[in-house]
Amino acid sequence: MKKNRLWVLFALLIIALAANGYAEENYKIGVLAKNGPVKALQMWKATGDYLTSKIPGKTFEIVPLGFNEVYPAIESGKISFFLANSSMFVTAKVRYGAKAVATMVNSRQGQPLKYFGGVIITSDANDQINALNDLKGKKFMAVQESSFGGWQMAYKALLDAGINPYTDFTKLDFGGKHDNVVYAVMNGVVDAGTVRTDTLERMASAGEIDMADFKIINPQKFNDFPFACSTTLYPEWPLAKVKSTSDTVARSIVDALKQLKATDAAAKSAKVVGWVDALDYAPVEALQKTLKVGAFMAAK
């Protein structure tokens, strides 16, 4: 009888240890919630579920993060992976040793896109603004200072045109969200603004705006790129691992993501075609160095 009890206790101990081991295999993926946490979960929860279903013994949880929450989450060890704009990744790479493991292939207007840009807009009725130089002395709005497509790309284009937005604009505001910037321009709160490419088309498709009400400043044309754009194109958002996350786990995630089909629920909700191995983010790092932002921000 005593021997049977010992076997039962031993079996329970094994079960408890196994359960504890599986509990430790939960991985949190931080996602930059550029349009708020609710939309971020709507877009990316299915990707977490997809990875959980594809990788045995591991679960993946999506954690929406605001612009000011990404770096603290990395530094504190709250997350194992993160999905953020390309500039924020470069900052995390330089500061915290993060490593890009995959790049999303966006799905927009039926085309797979590995690159994106920024678009500078004004009201179509504004006859005073037709080129970048016309923005001097005007009120301007961007998304956030840390927003790559919603500020830093346009900032670089403005500097290249001889315009310092911090001294040449009468007012420089940050709207917090891409849609807020579009509405501020539409309603005359500011003279012009900048958002990432595909924002205007997305809002127009949803019936929220009419593209004809806006004028594109410094329009650029690129082969196989369907959106209004005012800047150079840069690689799309990467999925990155924090320094402490094992390469083995990262590789298993990349392998699973590369198997994702455009018709899968996770791809549809995230509005992506799929994923590829990480692209080269050196041009993004060069932009940061030029602007002295992100990892290369000048000490105050």
Summary of predicted features, one role per range:
Residues M1-V8:
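Bacterial N-terminal signal peptides that target proteins for export
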Residues K28-T52, P112-V182, D198, A267, ...:
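Bilobed "Venus flytrap"/periplasmic-binding protein-like clamshell domains
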Residues E24, G30-A46, I55, T199, ...:
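An extracytoplasmic/periplasmic, membrane-proximal ligand-sensing/linker region
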Residues K139-T248:
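Pocket-lining segment of extracytoplasmic ligand-binding domains
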Residues A19-A23:
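Boundary at the C-terminal end of the N-terminal hydrophobic targeting segment
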Residues N68-S86, V90-T91, R95-Y96, F116, ...:
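Short helices/loops that flank or line small-molecule/ion binding pockets
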Residues E24-V90:
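Extracytoplasmic small-molecule ligand-binding "clamshell" domains
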Residues L9-A18:
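Bacterial N-terminal signal peptides
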